[in-house]
């Protein structure tokens, strides 16, 4: 399951939900017919409950959405704080040279001389660009996810090649 965001609050009295998206393209979520909700983003697949998306629109830096089965504010309050996710195959296909963060987490990172720098443990959005969090034991590297440093992303090989030195 790919975690997309989190329900942060009810919105109004008719069951609408305010959503904080974790990615930079929440408008793509409107193309999905269903969302899945869970209390624990790392929980088993069976813990995710499917909801049909009735309506969704941008609101500030996030979204507001209406899910079937959430008819009023009380029902919205009952699911406040839950994570929003979707199976990978339910997601719209990314454009060329675009990636879902969930597809990058867990990839090995190597530099131009094939030195292993670690594995992607997460990403950070800084506003200007995204940053890879690369862990290698006790060492964490923060590598900007921009063309100047990221030379190649090979999802099939589960590897990212970067212009970055091991001692940086």
From Swiss-Prot:
Domain spans labelled PRC barrel: 96-168
Example of a GO cellular component annotation carried by this entry: ribosome
Key words of the record: Chaperone, Cytoplasm, Ribosome biogenesis, rRNA processing
Localization, UniProt: Cytoplasm
A GO term for molecular function: ribosome binding
GO biological process, one term: rRNA processing
Subunit structure: Binds ribosomal protein uS19.
HAMAP family: Ribosome_mat_RimM
Function in brief: An accessory protein needed during the final step in the assembly of 30S ribosomal subunit, possibly for assembly of the head region. Essential for efficient processing of 16S rRNA. May be needed both before and after RbfA during the maturation of 16S rRNA. It has affinity for free ribosomal 30S subunits but not for 70S ribosomes.
Record comment regarding domains: The PRC barrel domain binds ribosomal protein uS19.
Family from the record: Belongs to the RimM family.
Name of the protein in its database record: Ribosome maturation factor RimM
Phylogenetic lineage: Bacteria, Pseudomonadati, Pseudomonadota, Betaproteobacteria, Rhodocyclales
């Amino acid at each position: 399951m790919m975690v997309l965001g989190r329900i942060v609050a009810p919105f109004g009295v008719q069951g609408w939900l305010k959503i904080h998206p974790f990615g930079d393209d929440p408008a793509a979520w409107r193309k999905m017919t269903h969302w899945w909700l869970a209390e624990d983003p790392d929980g088993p697949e069976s813990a995710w409950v499917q909801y049909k998306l009735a309506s969704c629109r941008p609101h500030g830096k996030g979204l507001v959405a209406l899910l079937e089965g959430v008819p009023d504010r009380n029902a919205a309050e009952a699911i406040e704080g839950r994570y929003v996710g979707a199976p990978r195959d339910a997601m719209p296909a990314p454009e060329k040279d675009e990636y879902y963060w969930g597809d990058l987490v867990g990839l090995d990172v190597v530099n131009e001389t094939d030195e292993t720098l670690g594995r992607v443990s997460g990403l950070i959005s800084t506003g200007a660009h995204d940053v890879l969090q690369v862990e290698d034991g006790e060492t964490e590297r923060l590598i900007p996810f921009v063309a100047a440093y990221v030379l190649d992303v090979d999802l099939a090989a589960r590897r990212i090649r970067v212009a970055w030195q091991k001692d940086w």
